[in-house]
Swiss-Prot record:
It is found in: Cytoplasm. SUPFAM superfamilies: DNA helicase RuvA subunit, C-terminal domain, Nucleic acid-binding proteins, RuvA domain 2-like. Homotetramer. Forms an RuvA(8)-RuvB(12)-Holliday junction (HJ) complex. HJ DNA is sandwiched between 2 RuvA tetramers; dsDNA enters through RuvA and exits via RuvB. An RuvB hexamer assembles on each DNA strand where it exits the tetramer. Each RuvB hexamer is contacted by two RuvA subunits (via domain III) on 2 adjacent RuvB subunits; this complex drives branch migration. In the full resolvosome a probable DNA-RuvA(4)-RuvB(12)-RuvC(2) complex forms which resolves the HJ. InterPro entries: DNA_helicase_Holl-junc_RuvA_I, Hlx-hairpin-Hlx_DNA-bd_motif, NA-bd_OB-fold, RuvA, RuvA_2-like, RuvA_C, RuvA_C_sf. Residues 1-63 are annotated as: Domain I. Belongs to the RuvA family. One of its GO terms (molecular function) is four-way junction DNA binding. Keywords: Cytoplasm, DNA damage, DNA recombination, DNA repair, DNA-binding. Residues 64-141 are annotated as: Domain II. This is Holliday junction branch migration complex subunit RuvA. Disulfide bonds: none annotated. The RuvA-RuvB-RuvC complex processes Holliday junction (HJ) DNA during genetic recombination and DNA repair, while the RuvA-RuvB complex plays an important role in the rescue of blocked DNA replication forks via replication fork reversal (RFR). RuvA specifically binds to HJ cruciform DNA, conferring on it an open structure. The RuvB hexamer acts as an ATP-dependent pump, pulling dsDNA into and through the RuvAB complex. HJ branch migration allows RuvC to scan DNA until it finds its consensus sequence, where it cleaves and resolves the cruciform DNA. The keyword DNA damage applies.
Amino acid sequence: MIGKLNGKIDSHCDDYVIIDVNGVGYLVYASGKTLAKLVEGKFYKLFIETHVREEHIHLYGFLTLEEKNFFNLLQSVNGIGTKMALSILSNLTPTDIQIAINNDDRNIFKAISGVGAKLAERIMLELKDKITKIFSSSAIIKDSNISSIAINEVMKALVNLGFTRFEAQNTVQGIITQNPKISIDELIKTALKNRNSSF
């Protein structure tokens, strides 16, 4: 499975790019917003989601882990596949999606080609609880390299290790405020170290 590609954009098409990695060209599909940022001849790091089927292997590329995570999150909704997930991400950023669901704004989804009233309703119903948890973490990650979904997973891990939800959120927020560029592994280690030192 391919998780990341570092290379030069060799060619640019309507819904994909060819990225040259050490002489090997990989065809990578991406959202319109991501494609608009990729310039032929320049080097980029793309986070990759690999879909393996009997008849094909498709690679989907993202400039941020947050967009990749939302690509997978959207596909958890009944009726949304890879093409529709990319279409939504071509029109809306992850933050746009969070805000729309938090504000119960179906119209922003219905304005996207292929998303009718029924699918917009399913997006609201099936992602509401997930997005609410993610949205509560968004303030924590304002100046951080870590995505909101990853922050939520860190807090769940800390709760499983004995933190209350309140303790986990306050601890994570305090650590990221002091070190916005901290990695997920170091974030968890620091949180546990801080908790142990307080006893």
